Amino acid sequence: VYKRCVAEGMAAMGDLSPVVLGPLHPCIFDVLGHLTRISGLDEVSFHMSGTEAIMCAVRLARFNMRKPLIVQFQGAYHGWWDGVQTGVGNERQVADSLTLLDMSPRSLACIRARRSEIAAVLVSPLQGLNPGSPPPNDVTLMDSKVRTTADQATADKYRVWLQQLQALCTECKIALIFDEVYTGFRMA
């Protein structure tokens, strides 16, 4: 099915160049229509990578919220941009990003305490399905027998954590950015 979909997409693109930016072809309008209908969003933007999408989302959050900080959670991956690479090997001392623990009441307390400085919280919704492990790769996700390392109780706890995080961000007027590229929708 995957190969057939890719072949159909390639055929629909015809003789267009491999890089298409902007509404240059009717199929792009079709895709925009589908994405806005499915997502319920008024606007959709295309990016060349997940890193670019996160950079744009963070920039928009900082501009619109008029606050400097972003929050991310330990073990999550938000691209190659040094603004979200706070681990070993990043020579930049990231002063505008806080890295907190997933599913921790102390993290929620920190966000609440620093709400006047925090523009956005980045979270990877699938992280809780594989605690302590990197998210699954595309090949694994295409397998219909995908298993997670989380049991149902852990998945339920993570769902509650995400709901608490969403409620806190709404209350504190902080943008909550779900960085999710593994489920096939490819929206950050």
Where are these regions (language model features)?
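Catalytic PLP-binding core of fold-type I/II PLP enzymes
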Residues: 139-187
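Hydrophobic beta-strand scaffold residues
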Residues: 20, 118, 176-177
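PLP-dependent aspartate aminotransferase-fold enzymes
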Residues: 30-147, 152-153, 157
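Short, function-defining helix-loop hinge/capping sites that tune catalysis or transport
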Residues: 132, 187-188
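Acidic, glycine-rich active-site loops and adjacent beta-strand->loop/helix elements
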Residues: 15, 25-26, 50-51, 74-78, ...
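Glycine-rich phosphate-binding segment of PLP-dependent enzymes
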Residues: 1-23, 32-44
